[in-house]
C-alpha cells in the first residue's frame, strides 16, 4: 500500500509543474486572484478559466 501511495504522490508532483500552471489564464495576459477581488474597468475578468478553486483570472488594465 505504501508503494501505491508513493507512486501516486510522485505522479501528482510531476503533473503540477509550475511552468504549466494556469496556462490558459496567462495566455490572455491574466493572473489568478481570489474570487472575491472586484474587477474595475479597464481591467478584464475572464472568470475561473484554469485557475485553482476559489480563484479567478483577472487582467489588470493599463490605466491610461
From Swiss-Prot:
Q: Please name the Pfam families in this protein's record.
A: Myotoxins (PF00819)
Recorded GO molecular functions are:
potassium channel regulator activity; toxin activity
Instruction: Please state what the protein is called.
Output: Myotoxin-2
- Is this entry keyworded Secreted? yes
The record's section on SUPFAM superfamilies has: Defensin-like (SSF57392)
Positions of disulphide bridges: 32-51
Outline what the protein does.
Cationic peptide that possesses multiple functions. It acts as a cell-penetrating peptide (CPP), and as a potent voltage-gated potassium channel (Kv) inhibitor. It exhibits antimicrobial activities, hind limb paralysis, and severe muscle necrosis by a non-enzymatic mechanism.
Quaternary state and interactors: Monomer.
**InterPro entries named in the record:** Myo_ane_neurotoxin_sf, Myotoxin
The UniProt similarity line reads: Belongs to the crotamine-myotoxin family.
- Provide the Gene Ontology terms for cellular component: extracellular region
Q: An example of a Gene Ontology BP annotation on this entry?
A: envenomation resulting in occlusion of the pore of voltage-gated potassium channel in another organism
Localization: Secreted
- Where would one find the signal peptide in this protein? 1-21
> What UniProt keywords apply to this chain's record, in alphabetical order?
Antimicrobial, Disulfide bond, Ion channel impairing toxin, Myotoxin, Neurotoxin, Potassium channel impairing toxin, Secreted, Signal, Toxin, Voltage-gated potassium channel impairing toxin
Q: Where, by tissue, is this protein expressed?
A: Expressed by the venom gland.
